[in-house]
């Protein structure tokens, strides 16, 4: 029986933070180790350039950083094909063919794209590459005939757009070459979109409100001790709110089964009064360090041998290119533009 194929990846615009870890990376490692899937994991550097075209040095540095984060978190190049998007030219060619099947109006209606355009404040200067990046995503997914794509709930419109492109292509060219993917969405809503340390809905490097997998213990401690809690909880004896309190939100996400009873007791005590923010933050620091210290240590080890990291990326890219090339041949054959045998 053929294994389902998983495609997943990240835009390399900086080091990965713990929101990436609980939102997707942790689950990728789990699926990889189950040995039930063909796993493709990629660094979407071309997509990153759609809104960082004048910062190629940032993208180049980030490719290495994200690759380190992948390896440190447990992705294994023996079990997952890890590759760089720009090193697979077949993806750009597939994108060109798919763009002919999607209207500009449909791209502009994509809710995810509309939200991101507003967030980035492009105004009237929206890069064309950014507007059409859902088509590029469709090329990424279909090139490897991915059956399943793990994404956040905010990416559902992207999966649906890919499915539309697949149906449009297969209908137009009377073929079944392309596979309609299914999205895999987070089961844990709290982990699916981890807020920033300051309570902002989004954790990001630009907002300075994230904990990164590469952060050392001193940095982690400073960030945890500065976290947003209940602004009205001034004295230890004051009753406090746990809703919107980032310390308790993070404890819900990162706490293990063995922590559940203590977390429950802390919530009750905090709400009744008698538990200070410093104590809750120290407990969270221990919980986070338990999770992150092995990742941090592995990352330091891999960073000492970047030749290995780039050799791994090169090997993965060559392996991925062979698969994408086969799909492109099938696509061109279906379209009738395979002129030379």
Curated annotation (Swiss-Prot):
Motif 'HIGH' region, chain ranges: 12-20
EC category: ligase
Primary location class: cytoplasm
Gene: trpS
Reactions mediated catalytically: tRNA(Trp) + L-tryptophan + ATP = L-tryptophyl-tRNA(Trp) + AMP + diphosphate + H(+)
A Pfam short name: tRNA-synt_1b
Superkingdom of origin organism: Bacteria
Residue sites binding ATP per the record: 11-13, 19-20, 152-154, 194, 202-206
Lineage: Bacteria, Bacillati, Bacillota, Bacilli, Lactobacillales
UniProt record similarity statement: Belongs to the class-I aminoacyl-tRNA synthetase family.
Entry keywords, A to Z: Aminoacyl-tRNA synthetase, ATP-binding, Cytoplasm, Ligase, Nucleotide-binding, Protein biosynthesis
Protein name listed in UniProt: Tryptophan--tRNA ligase
Source organism (scientific name): Lactococcus lactis subsp. lactis (strain IL1403)
Keyword ATP-binding: yes
Record field: transmembrane: none
Record carries keyword Electron transport: no
BP term (GO), one: tryptophanyl-tRNA aminoacylation
